[in-house]
Amino acid sequence: DYGFKEEYTVLFEIYDQDPIEVNDKDGSWKKKEVEPFYRAATDKHGKFSEDGISIPADISEVWLSSDYLGTASPVKLTINADHRISFNQNDYVKSLLEKASTPISRGATANQHKYLDVWTLLPGMDWDDNGRPNNLSKEKNIPPADVLYNIKSIFDKAGGRNIHDNYPEFFNGDMISDIPITKDTEVSLVFVNSSAAWYNTVGYYTYPTSEIPTIENIKRILAFPNASPIYKTAGVGALVCGDEVKLKYWNEDTGKFEDKFPKGVTIGWYLQGMGFRSTPSNGDSQGDLVKGMGPRYSTTILNEPGKDGVQRQRTISLRDSKSNQIVAIGFEDNIDLDYCDAIFYVHIAEKDAIDEGVIPELPT
């Protein structure tokens, strides 16, 4: 039972071994060339129940795997005495969150986490040692199934090809990943998934739509300390699909946060590569925010040139044309150009509040 409240059919596989191979040196992972002994699809609510599945008699545990967004994967399951297996994703996630909730004493925020001076925190924001923030919305914000399917499809790496290979038109130098606001509106950032080995930190900034931003005139506001799923293949994770942070607009004139982003501002996105300290190291404690591998901006002109002198596009933003209130955002943290190192979607509270002519449509 994957526990989806809305209609969402999931394809899954069951293996007699862990289908993921992890590189112990850098935490990267890849799928092994092994075949599952069972494949099936859930019903439209993410549930599956069937007798007669043939499980080899000599195995005592199996691995449940799915590449569908919103599913924990892979999950090791023990075969029951009656030779059955069961899985409830809500209970599984709850158990992981309970394991991650033990605090460690340090010094800076209320939970005593240190962070870089360049970060501004939302009012009352803090996080636990795994990077799960305390200001998440009470309810998960899961988009409609067709949006999840489309996001999965666009960022799929099947056949050794990725979004950069499949959609070169998004990388011709004209792509704008920042989001211009055309009507006062509330804005939320919702976690979808991450396939990154790194522990990345994600935030945002704003600037007047009519102006060109510079490093000196943007205020970087923290949204997610550790943009990693709680079931991260190797290491420390914090989030599940649907975890939402309601963003706030920083008004420079009043020096205060406001709930709504005003017409005439543009929202940019910011990823600090390896910005979250997953283990104590070099005087930093687990949960601290550090320089890591440096910043990546959605505003391409803010990115440092590579060795070839090129300022690379680090994000891609794609608009759901049906609602015009959802924008999928993929981040690229390093060099493989798959743009799924952190996948979020932006939820715009008001209809017709973003410039449709700037943000390309999410392919269907």
Language model feature labels by segment:
Residues D1-C340, A349-T364:
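Extracellular distal adhesion/interaction modules in secreted or cell-surface proteins
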